[in-house]
Amino acid sequence: MTHSALAPSTGKAAVQLTRLGTFEQPIGVVTRPDDPLMYVIEKTGRLKTLAPDGARRTVLDLSKNVSTQNERGLLSVAFPPGDRSRIYVTYTDSVGALMVTEFAYTDAQVDPATERVLLRIPHPNDDHNGGSLAFDADGLLYVGVGDGGGVGTRGGVGDRNNNAQNLNVLLGKIVRIDPRPMGDYAYRIPPSNPFVKSSPLNPRAGKRRPEIFAYGLRNPWRIRIDDGYLWIADVGQSSWEEINRIPITRIGANFGWRLREGKHAYRGGGKPRGLFEPIFEYPHSDGRCAVIGGTVAGSSSGTELVGTYVFGDLCTGRFMQLRQTDSTGWTMTGLGSRLAYLTSISSGPGGSLIATSLNGGVYRLESAD
């Protein structure tokens, strides 16, 4: 991997924000091809649509089933490619376990009675849930799962149980499954997964979970698949934020947590060896604290950011772009605008760029005059 470089903002705003609507603690937006609707994910447990004319409608209400303490809640939604009859959801249940479930989607409505549980991942604390979903072109489902959290004590060591490096648990991982049921199993294990020989369908099953695609992550709050690459914005501990980009054909990558934070050895983590390098990292300086991913701006985004990865930071609310260059590898440039309590940046209808704020706003990013 090439080295990354920080490029200062020019001081001129590259984007401006246009408010599209107000929701209850929105944390993400998803879309479907050839569908003008935006599907707004509310942390409190509801999925709502936002039409071009501003009309809103609730299509799924899980508020009675979802724990919303701290970072818990309804976390992510994804539509499988080429299938308009199903929808996939992650949320934290009443005791905080991370649920990955499927619902039938008909007539622009989700029937809660059709819920089918794929995974229930026990989670010991109310933070570092991850929960982000993404499909690849073959219909395989990727799930970003946090390390289990629990870092509230002063001087506490991150990932105390070293879950992210433990291949017998799904915490601190990117999970990859084929969500189609097979016999008594709720899903299938892709044969190309790195630890597929550990599958319970294999009589010689070992202790490594076959659902694991990659590991060594702290809190992959947002993941994104674009042009055959998986982007992972992994929230750091106390010093560094990192962005990872990996071909989906590259299985079994270890991103290093808690052996290291970003590219730097982490206390008590041992000597880092054979780890997959982040393409970019930035320090906790100037008030920055947590990376918020993130999407690749397409040609129809309506901005000059085409081909760049657009992301932000929770504490500063600043928007940034990451661009690959021949001379420096990856360069970050500030985009001028800010949004308090930024929770996501994603692709909207027609390739537009959409941002959400926990304060309630859903915004479109547009080129500044």
Q: Where are each of the predicted segments found?
A:
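Conserved hydrophobic/aromatic pocket- or pore-lining residues that grip, position, or stack substrates
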Residues: 133, 174, 243
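Acidic, Gly/Ser/Thr-rich repeat motifs that build Ca2+-stabilized beta-propeller blades
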Residues: 1-150, 222-240, 287-326, 348-368
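Blade-edge beta-strand/turn elements of extracellular beta-propeller
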Residues: 6-22, 54-67, 103-124, 165-219, ...
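Acidic, glycine-rich loop-and-beta core segments that form the ion-binding/anion-interacting portion
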Residues: 194, 207-248
